[in-house]
Amino acid sequence: MMAATKRIASGVMSTALVAVLAGCSGSGSGGSASGGAGVDTEKGAHGAKENPPAGAAPKNAIKLIGDGSTAFTGVQPKLPAAKRLAAGEKPPQFVVFSWDGAGEDSQKLFSHFRGVAKKYNAKMTYFLSGVYLLPEEKKDLYNPPQHAPGRSDIGFNDTGGIRDTLAEVRAAWLEGNEIGTHFNGHFCGADGGVGTWSVDEWKSEISQAKAFVKSWKTNTPELKGEAPLPFDYDKELIGARTPCLEGQKNMVAAARTMGFRYDSSGVGNQVWPKKKDGVWDIPLQLVPMPGRAFETLSMDYNFMVNQSGTATQGDPSQHEYWGNQMRDGLLQAFDRSYNGNRAPLIIGNHFESWNGGTYMRAIEETIAQVCTKEGVRCVSFRQLADWLDAQDPRTLAKLTTLGVGEAPKTGWSSYLGTQQAAARPADKETGTRTGTDKDTEKGSEKGQGKDQGRGQEQEQDGGEGQAPGGGAAEAPGQAPAEDAGEAPDQAPDQAPGNASGQEDAGPDPAGATG
């Protein structure tokens, strides 16, 4: 079981506005979910061709890396290839389900949602915290920026927890899912939090996150007999989400020199992503919160704080309603993209049993409803980035002019019919891509629509996670709660259709804390 601690943050309200924190999961508290295997259809998303299953690779095909904690085993299996849109073709509806601080504990939620993904032909992104592969007795190997060696706001792990997490990471990758990073110690706020780190400090944090994944056999000698992780993490790691959604600017400046191709640490609206400083900026999104006068971030923790405040186990009589509210909000968000601009829907989650596990139920029901629809692809961030890179830059430029829920007035065939689909051949394989598509980046800057600017969080020095109206969201508190998971990610909830902050129409009827 993961030995993690959690720092709970209080919500902040300015007048009638609610500043909500996006949570980050470690080991949860309460509840349990079975690790069901689901039904493996062995097909790509709605018939897309996949790389062949890896199975048991011949010994001579496995190239151990370093101490044998990781290995090169060939192209990732079960990963559909990215294809360029034909002229006039309607874009797929992408949906990304992602998990912050992914690790397997006694709740068995990692294994459970692997089964859910297989059942509904979904691929997902698991943002692994590096310290979840570092045992408590070796904690001094972690040298966090601006903190003493061995310090972590989410604790470390034990041998059993490391073994279980490795098993899930190994299986997830072989099933075509992505292993990203949530970095290490999860420090938030003004006192040495990630939002205060320099570019060089971020480079150190990224290097250490990689090192813990690449050296778990050395650091946990009891597990030397375990199979290696079947990938080269230096090549596998292409994206992240920062703790508390802080520090994005300097993190990206560091990460872009270390092979990263995307980041999901921002706050935005349901519009098509663009590149920022050569990296795809694919933020969490503001989505409807049924019955409320404002929208909330597309993450389970944000719904929870708007419902039960910072109490992770609120009124049991409200649990079912709260889960339904989250599910219905996500489904409304899906519908306005699916029937509108087809912008990818980005959803963040945590392996937690907050409010009796109601958010896990909500996510599972959402997956079941959206991933089975025609034209929908439930993909990892890697797959989404591959698809974006494969497109004609002029096509992407037109897509970015569409506002939230805005379908082309003349229809997709006419709207995208003038694009030259054969301008350059799409890459055959999604497993590896190199370099920055400068043409795509420049093309996506053209024709910015009136709604495109909505939801773009403005970076300031140490300014991520600001409350609506300019007030800073409160940093996580300092008193750890035993075995409660990670500190929450910070991000503001906004009034509908404006990620930069508008006043709520009235008091928050659900009683979110202020």
Map each language-model feature to its residues.
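N-terminal pre-catalytic segment of deacetylase/amide-hydrolase enzymes
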Residues: 3-7, 11-14, 18, 24-97, ...
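Ser/Thr/Gly/Pro-rich low-complexity, disordered linker/stalk segments of secreted
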Residues: 43-53, 428-514
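Active-site-adjacent pocket scaffolds in enzyme catalytic domains
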Residues: 44-65, 143-159, 226-341, 392-404, ...
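Active-site beta->alpha N-cap acidic-glycine motif
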Residues: 61-178, 185-189, 212, 219-253, ...
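C-terminal domain-boundary segment and adjacent tail
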Residues: 68-74, 78-79, 125, 262-274, ...
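Well-ordered, non-membrane alpha-helical segments in soluble/globular domains
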Residues: 109-111, 158-166, 202-207, 323-332, ...
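Aromatic- and acid-rich polysaccharide-binding/catalytic face
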Residues: 177, 181-182, 282-285
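Active-site cleft segment of glycoside hydrolase catalytic domains centered on the general acid/base Glu
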Residues: 190-208
